[in-house]
Amino acid sequence: MSFPYFISPEQAMRERSELARKGIARAKSVVALAYAGGVLFVAENPSRSLQKISELYDRVGFAAAGKFNEFDNLRRGGIQFADTRGYAYDRRDVTGRQLANVYAQTLGTIFTEQAKPYEVELCVAEVAHYGETKRPELYRITYDGSIADEPHFVVMGGTTEPIANALKESYAENASLTDALRIAVAALRAGSADTSGGDQPTLGVASLEVAVLDANRPRRAFRRITGSALQALLVDQESPQSDGESSG
């Protein structure tokens, strides 16, 4: 007589966690950090069409690491939620904490109820409304729905430990955009060097996706930095030239 295969709930959760962590670790890294003018997002991403960084609403941005189809589905759902709430109530009623909580609830439900967890890690960031002086808010949401409020920076995907260690050593509050980008790129290079046996790779315009939430912009704070505008900020980095321009 054969008995049905049994797995304890604890073992099932451990296996789900391991699956999700391995999937996220295979992804290229993403960094989000607060700087003097708002929040800077920097991702290792050679693709120009499969973007890891996005606007969610007027003062709220999104970044993710992991499986693209899964986090893009979450991104679109967040935009729809924000648009609906902003239309039904008031645009100022849409906050980063609110969207982070929605993502945490969604990922927690998927982790416990679906056959396979999402292999994603998310960051939701918000800057103050134009003319206000509130500090930027950074939220990290993990594959199981855990949520954390990070005061300075978030690191996701790839080998996070060397990147986080580099940021702990070099991060400076109220840094300029140029300095913040230099700090973020140097940290990403430290993570890439750890996985490539110590060689410091070149991260330039062609291999980076960069955007900011600019607290000094009225209404919509999100702005991508591409092409020659990014190249100008990377003058100290060895990077290839690109013909694109900064977009609004």
Swiss-Prot record:
Protein's GO biological process: modification-dependent protein catabolic process; proteasomal protein catabolic process; proteasome-mediated ubiquitin-dependent protein catabolic process; proteolysis involved in protein catabolic process; symbiont-mediated perturbation of host defenses
Instruction: Report the PTM annotation.
Output: Phosphorylated by the PknB kinase at three threonine residues (Thr-84, Thr-202, and Thr-178) in a sequential manner. Phosphorylation enhances proteolytic activity of the proteasome.
Give one Pfam family, short name only: Proteasome
Q: How is its activity regulated?
A: The formation of the proteasomal ATPase ARC-20S proteasome complex, likely via the docking of the C-termini of ARC into the intersubunit pockets in the alpha-rings, may trigger opening of the gate for substrate entry. Interconversion between the open-gate and close-gate conformations leads to a dynamic regulation of the 20S proteasome proteolysis activity. In vitro, chymotryptic and tryptic activities of the proteasome are both completely inhibited by epoxomicin and by the peptidyl boronate inhibitor MLN-273. Also inhibited by Mg(2+), Ca(2+) and SDS.
Location of the protein in the cell: Cytoplasm
**GO CC annotation terms, alphabetical:** cytoplasm; peptidoglycan-based cell wall; plasma membrane; proteasome core complex, alpha-subunit complex
- The keyword Acetylation appears for this protein: yes
Indicate the family of this protein: Belongs to the peptidase T1A family.
Function noted in UniProt: Component of the proteasome core, a large protease complex with broad specificity involved in protein degradation. The M.tuberculosis proteasome is able to cleave oligopeptides not only after hydrophobic but also after basic, acidic and small neutral residues. In complex with the ATPase Mpa, degrades protein targets conjugated to a prokaryotic ubiquitin-like protein (Pup). Among the identified substrates of the M.tuberculosis proteasome are the pupylated FabD, PanB and Mpa proteins.
PANTHER family with a match to the protein in the record: PROTEASOME SUBUNIT ALPHA/BETA
**Name of the featured protein:** Proteasome subunit alpha
Q: What taxonomic ancestry is recorded?
A: Bacteria, Bacillati, Actinomycetota, Actinomycetes, Mycobacteriales
